[in-house]
């Protein structure tokens, strides 16, 4: 293709049977709701809509026992949490093999260690040909591709993580940045999706800028660079746990998801741990909706006290307030849809509470 790569990241459809308006923003051309005429459209089901988990308001907690200790009297467990002023949010799930309540303490302890071990580094200083703006353009476009392909939220978060981890270890040419982005989404799709898009779908969405062979070669390179390890915890994993601990409703949970997704586009947040971003997003959502408190139960399960996340909350508030003037509108447009409760359009996102937190920075 003679197209200048990245300066015009494009997925312009050239097939005559595809219809839909073309929208260009900051060099990115994207169709609005024009279906792909490949196998992807048939394979993706309604179950892949980004609906997230069903929120429960039951009281549960990561058990402090190994499996051999499950038979400890329930009253003893309740007493231990009463002393800590922490609700046992897992009590009702004990004995349910599909929920693994007996193992949750160890699972989240391991996830906290893992997010630190696999954390991407601050890599932009050693990149000669790319910069913050190019990364933001790429991520903003990938968010639109994720919506277009109807991929899971986990796939999107893992895609951005793979990009940042790869860039932490490799210098990338400007002309290959979009290639790296679609290859990361291909890898993430194979890892997360029941039916992953085909390589041809990514060739198509990039307007044939890269061949199938180029994508395969980049896939091999990225897999080796990342040592075939994509087991890092995602913000979503921690948010779901926190939402359960806070017994939050769908509006607060969706607002926290929106705030978290805004951070994907901003390079400033790549050195923040997923657990911290999840805690800060839920904290801000609680304050914006009804000024709910950050309870001892939330502090216990998130691993963060109110004081420990206020700095990140402030940065997140500044980012949210900047959205009206931002060139990168993919997340805001995505969450203006009815299936996301039009959460990006609520008046609280322009109110004095958000401004108050932003001023603390």
From Swiss-Prot:
Pfam families in the record: Cyclin_C, Cyclin_N
An annotated GO BP: cell division
Keywords: Cell cycle, Cell division, Cyclin, Mitosis
Keyword flag Cell division: yes
Family to which this protein belongs: Belongs to the cyclin family. Cyclin AB subfamily.
Function statement: Essential for the control of the cell cycle at the G2/M (mitosis) transition. Interacts with the CDC2 protein kinase to form MPF. G2/M cyclins accumulate steadily during G2 and are abruptly destroyed at mitosis.
Protein name: G2/mitotic-specific cyclin-B
Lineage summary: Eukaryota, Metazoa, Cnidaria, Hydrozoa, Hydroidolina
């Amino acid at each position: 293709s003679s197209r200048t790569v990245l300066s015009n990241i494009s997925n312009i459809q050239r097939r005559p049977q595809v219809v839909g308006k073309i929208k260009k923003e900051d060099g990115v051309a994207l169709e609005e709701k024009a279906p792909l005429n490949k196998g992807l459209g048939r394979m993706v089901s309604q179950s892949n809509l980004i609906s997230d988990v069903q929120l429960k308001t039951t009281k549960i907690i990561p058990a402090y026992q190994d499996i051999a200790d499950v038979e400890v009297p329930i009253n003893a467990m309740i007493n231990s949490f009463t002393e800590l002023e922490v609700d046992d949010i897992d009590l009702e799930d004990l004995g349910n093999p599909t929920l693994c309540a007996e193992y949750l303490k160890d699972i989240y302890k391991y996830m906290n260690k893992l997010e630190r071990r696999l954390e991407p580094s601050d890599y932009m200083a050693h990149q000669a040909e790319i910069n913050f703006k190019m990364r933001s353009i790429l991520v903003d476009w990938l968010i639109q591709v994720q919506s277009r392909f109807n991929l899971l939220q986990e796939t999107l978060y893992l895609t951005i993580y793979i990009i940042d981890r790869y860039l932490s270890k490799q210098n990338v040419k400007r002309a290959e940045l979009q290639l790296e982005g679609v290859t990361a989404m291909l890898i993430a799709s194979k890892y997360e999706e029941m039916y992953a898009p085909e390589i041809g779908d990514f060739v198509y969405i990039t307007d044939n800028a890269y061949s199938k062979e180029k994508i395969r070669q980049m896939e091999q390179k990225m897999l080796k660079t990342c040592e075939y390890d994509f087991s890092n915890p995602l913000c979503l994993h921690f948010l779901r746990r926190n939402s359960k601990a806070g017994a939050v409703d769908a509006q607060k949970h969706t607002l926290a998801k929106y705030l978290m997704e805004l951070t994907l586009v901003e390079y400033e947040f790549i050195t923040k741990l997923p657990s911290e971003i999840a805690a800060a997003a839920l904290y801000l959502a609680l304050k914006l909706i009804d000024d709910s408190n950050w309870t001892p139960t939330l502090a216990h399960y998130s691993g963060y006290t109110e004081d420990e996340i206020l700095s990140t909350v402030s940065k997140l508030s500044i980012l949210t307030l900047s959205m009206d003037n931002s060139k990168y509108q993919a997340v805001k447009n995505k969450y203006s849809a009815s299936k996301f409760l039009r959460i990006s359009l609520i008046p609280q996102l322009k109110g004095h509470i958000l401004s108050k937190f932003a001023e603390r920075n």
